[in-house]
Amino acid sequence: IMNNWVKKQADFCIVGKKGVRDNLQIAVALLGYRQEKAGEEIIECLKHQFADGHAVLTWYPYDDTRYSDQPFWIVWAVCELIKETGDFSILEQKVSWQDGGEATVLEHVKAAVRRLIEDKGENGLVKIRFADWNDALNVTDDPEAETVMLSHQFCLALRELRRLMERIGEEDYAEFLGQEYETLKAAINEKAWDGEWYARALSRKGNIGAKDSPGSKIYLNAQTWAVLADVAEGTRLSAVLAAVDSMEQDFGFPLNMPPYPAYDPHVGRMSGMLPGLFENGGVYCHATGFKILMDCKCGRGTKALETLKKIMPDSGKNPSSRSGAEPYVFTNCYSTNSGYYGKSYQSWPTGTSAWSMMGLYEG
């Protein structure tokens, strides 16, 4: 599966998806074996970024809803492209903006950084706007709400871009990025730490993913990206790893626990889903892929491999005869709801293929 079918699945995603966030993740996975195609896809995604730094969710069909995370994926993907190819000249390539004109790849990256800095809220974290990576977490009753997951991701982007800028001699900008990293990291640890794990979002109307939050108490992505970005250190790192381990299920790790029992307008669409399905407490295999990289970073190779096996097609504890998915294709989600336990939802077009590859080949 990992030497053949997962690559076919990634190729399918590149053809079938036309979204900045989605295609950049697939493109980075392609860097391991189709560098030219990966580079072309990353440049194509940059063409759908606006000069103010934000980017469309999808260009076909066209959707410019303000998902706050698009700029992060741009910075991350360009850094990964150059790390894999060693071709620094990419930074000088001219690429058009979605709203007209053109600029170098480096200017596109800097615009993405500016967008995320300008989008910071009162706690110093990045505002969630309509949603972040989790399309269904819509804190629409508080336009000032801040996303902890994306703030972790922005820390990672600042760290990686600083290293790149040092390599090309942009020392002043590298120093600026380093200062931004430390400032954001400190804000996250001051405002989002909840004693045993990180909250998922901060809001004047009540934090989401905290121990005193109604409905659901802990979110996976707010922990995994804290580790990947080096935000969680020392005793907090140990606590985060323990919190993640406590979420383990037979066939992966749920996006949040426990599921929301009823619709909560403060949380948005995910809380209206049947408990245990999709984003509402389902095992979101794409996000479990983030967890695999977290394990690898921490030297937890055995746990990384065990986790990968849990979400593999036709896995031992959730065979295709129960999940309903093809025995050779990764799926996006498995249900933890007792009435649909282990059932698969949406195989083929999912970032699970990309993150599973990255976990196995790069972790």
Predicted regions and their residues:
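Low-complexity, Ser/Thr/Pro/Gly-enriched N-terminal "stalk/linker" regions
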Residues: 1-18, 40, 44, 115, ...
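Conserved hydrophobic/aromatic pocket- or pore-lining residues that grip, position, or stack substrates
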Residues: 5-9, 26, 45, 181, ...
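Conserved helix-loop functional segments at active or binding sites
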Residues: 11-12, 47, 51, 80, ...
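Short helix-capping and inter-helix turn/linker motifs at the boundaries of alpha-helical repeat units
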Residues: 16-18, 215-218, 281-283
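Aromatic-rich carbohydrate-recognition surfaces in CAZymes
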Residues: 20-23, 29-126, 147-151, 155, ...
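Acidic/His metal-coordination segments adjacent to aromatic residues that form catalytic metal sites
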Residues: 52-65, 129-146, 203-212, 267-277, ...
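Catalytic cores of carbohydrate-active enzymes
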Residues: 56, 153-268, 309, 313-344
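C-terminal ends of transmembrane alpha-helices
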Residues: 121-130, 191-193
